[in-house]
Amino acid sequence: MNFEKLVPNIFYVDITNGLKLFVDCLGFAIGHDEIRSHQPFCVLEKDGLRINLFENAKLAKEHNPEFRLVTKNIEEVYDKVSRSHPEFLHPNLPKITLRPWGAREFALMDGQLGVVIQEW
C-alpha cells in the first residue's frame, strides 16, 4: 500500500478567515477556487502541500483541528508571521520554544484551528 499525500478538509463559518491565515499569513496559493459559489470551497497549495477549505457553519462548529507544519527554517517563518500577522500567534506558544521532545516550535491560531510550526 502506497500513499502520496494526506489532504485535510478544514471547515470555517466564514472561509475568508481561513484565507487570511493560510494565504495572507502563510503564503499558500489558491489552486482551485469556488469561493464565490453557493457552497464556498477552495484548494490551497504550497510546497507540495494541499489543504481544502470549506465554508460550512454546521461542520465548523463540530471540528476544531490542530495541524503541525514542519520547516527547516523556523526563524524565517516566525519573523515573517510575527511581523505581518502577529494576531495569529497563539497565546500559549507565541515565541520559538525548545520543547522537551527536541523540536523547536511556536503556534498560530485563528477562530477555527491551531497550527504548530515545528523544526526538528
Regions found by a protein language model. Name each.
Residues I30-P65, D110, G114-W120:
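Conserved short beta-strand elements that form part of the metal-binding/catalytic scaffold
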Residues F11-I15, R36-S37, P100:
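Conserved beta-strand-loop-alpha-helix junction that forms the acyl-donor binding cleft
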Residues M1-L19, F67:
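N-terminal beta-strand motif that seeds the catalytic metal site of vicinal oxygen chelate
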Residues S82-W120:
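Vicinal oxygen chelate
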Residues G18-V23, V81, Q112:
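Conserved active-site tyrosine of GNAT-family acetyltransferases
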Residues D24-I30, H85-E87:
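Conserved acetyl-CoA-binding loop of GNAT-fold acetyltransferases
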Residues E66-H85:
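Mid-chain, well-packed structural core segment of small domains
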Residues V7-N9, V43, E66-R68, E105-A107:
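Short aromatic/hydrophobic contact patches that present stacked aromatics
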